[in-house]
């Protein structure tokens, strides 16, 4: 038989050129722990999320990063179109977070956030609703459709609050409860 080199050789049957088989993309959901950075490059002594993945997944890119102090749902893939559809602001994908604050959020501050707080990179607005929990006071559900760098933390800080806990529980169609106790899961 003949040997074909993909990308160099073409195969034609009855003057019709066969197309290369579409590349199968990889999609992985990860439950990122606090303390890990979403970068391939080591940043000081902080471990990266890639330290949690096997060697054959090191090529995957992160859609919608989380900062070192945050935890929760990440999607890693080698599908650039998927990353674009999930992260570009024009697609307005829903993101849901559980946020802990250093003190109770008053109604005036809640309304300000929902109307929009002016930050150095523009207005930041999102929905904030209290989560009922005696065990974990000052917990809130945040729903947003954009995701600028440290936006939730900066928005609360502008109003005199500190974020003590930040966990993404939903990103587009994906939810953290799909992971149960796993660090990552192929989807």
Give residue spans per PLM region.
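Basic, flexible Lys/Arg- and Gly-enriched helix-loop patches that mediate nucleic-acid binding at interfaces
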Residues: 1-187
